[in-house]
Amino acid sequence: AAAQHLCGSHLVDALYLVCGEKGFFYNPKGIVEQCCHKPCNIFDLQNYCN
């Protein structure tokens, strides 16, 4: 999976896709730092799933 910058609604959409029915813990400070300011990949996103 290619790392990419995900910000705002794109980041939320990606979390819905990755986490599905499990849902996710949205901690803007942590995930924006990791995935918006820097590129992140699908494995990084999975860390935020419930």
UniProtKB/Swiss-Prot annotation:
It is found in: Secreted. Disulfide bonds join C7-C36, C19-C49, C35-C40. One of its GO terms (cellular component) is extracellular space. GO terms for biological process: glucose metabolic process. Gene3D superfamilies: Insulin-like. Pfam families: Insulin. Keywords: Carbohydrate metabolism, Disulfide bond, Glucose metabolism, Hormone, Secreted. The keyword Secreted applies. GO terms for molecular function: hormone activity. PROSITE patterns: INSULIN. It comes from the Eukaryota. Heterodimer of a B chain and an A chain linked by two disulfide bonds. Belongs to the insulin family. Insulin decreases blood glucose concentration. It increases cell permeability to monosaccharides, amino acids and fatty acids. It accelerates glycolysis, the pentose phosphate cycle, and glycogen synthesis in liver. This is Insulin. It comes from Oncorhynchus kisutch.
